[in-house]
């Protein structure tokens, strides 16, 4: 269990340091095209590989540019992580776009559209929490 805690601690430190480096250390303009957030950091048990999930607020082209810039800076980031975290061998850094927020927004949009369609058909009254077919009478 101590190994798991160490991996979690290293992942948290990597997240902190990479966030700082994204603001002040990476000079590649592609990284600064959109609003970038690190959503998760996964580190392998042997601390040799690190996958950093990022969310980029912006158009698809901006997301691609940011990801390209981050991948191009991965060698620099690896060296900085090794120096800042005083690790003999810093993990290989790979960036991956986190589409979780995008998917969540899409699902919410679909649910809202479904509710609008049901209200237009008269299946449920507007602003009602009552489900169609339920026998509950609104209180009030």
Curated annotation (Swiss-Prot):
A GO BP entry: maturation of SSU-rRNA
Which SUPFAM superfamilies does the UniProt record give?
Ribosome-binding factor A, RbfA
Its main localization is cytoplasm
Q: Which GO terms describe its molecular function?
A: ribosomal small subunit binding
One Pfam family, short name: RBFA
* Location of the protein in the cell: Cytoplasm
The record's InterPro entries line, in alphabetical order, gives:
KH_dom-like_a/b, RbfA, RbfA_dom_sf, Ribosome-bd_factorA_CS
Which key words are in the record?
Cytoplasm, Ribosome biogenesis
Q: Where is this region: Disordered?
A: 115-140
Where is there biased composition of kind Polar residues? 128-140
| Superkingdom as given in the UniProt entry | Bacteria
Kindly list the GO CC terms recorded for this protein: cytosol
Which NCBIfam families does the UniProt entry name for this protein?
rbfA (TIGR00082)
Q: Which family does it belong to?
A: Belongs to the RbfA family.
- HAMAP family with a match to the protein in the record: RbfA (MF_00003)
Q: How does the annotation summarize its subunit structure?
A: Monomer. Binds 30S ribosomal subunits, but not 50S ribosomal subunits or 70S ribosomes.
- Its function? One of several proteins that assist in the late maturation steps of the functional core of the 30S ribosomal subunit. Associates with free 30S ribosomal subunits (but not with 30S subunits that are part of 70S ribosomes or polysomes). Required for efficient processing of 16S rRNA. May interact with the 5'-terminal helix region of 16S rRNA.
Q: What is this protein called?
A: Ribosome-binding factor A
């Amino acid at each position: 269990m101590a190994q798991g805690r160490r991996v979690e601690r290293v992942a948290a430190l990597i997240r902190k340091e990479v966030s700082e480096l994204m603001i002040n250390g990476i000079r590649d303009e592609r990284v600064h095209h959109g609003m970038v957030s690190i959503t998760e950091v996964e580190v392998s048990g042997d601390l040799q590989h690190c996958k950093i999930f990022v969310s980029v607020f912006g158009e698809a082209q901006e997301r691609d540019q940011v990801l390209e810039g981050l991948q191009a800076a991965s060698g620099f980031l690896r060296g900085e992580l090794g120096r800042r975290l005083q690790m003999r061998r810093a993990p290989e850094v790979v960036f991956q776009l986190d589409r979780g927020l995008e998917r969540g927004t899409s699902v919410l949009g679909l649910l809202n559209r479904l509710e609008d369609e049901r209200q237009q058909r008269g299946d449920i009254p507007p602003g009602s929490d009552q489900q169609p077919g339920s026998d509950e009478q609104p209180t009030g």
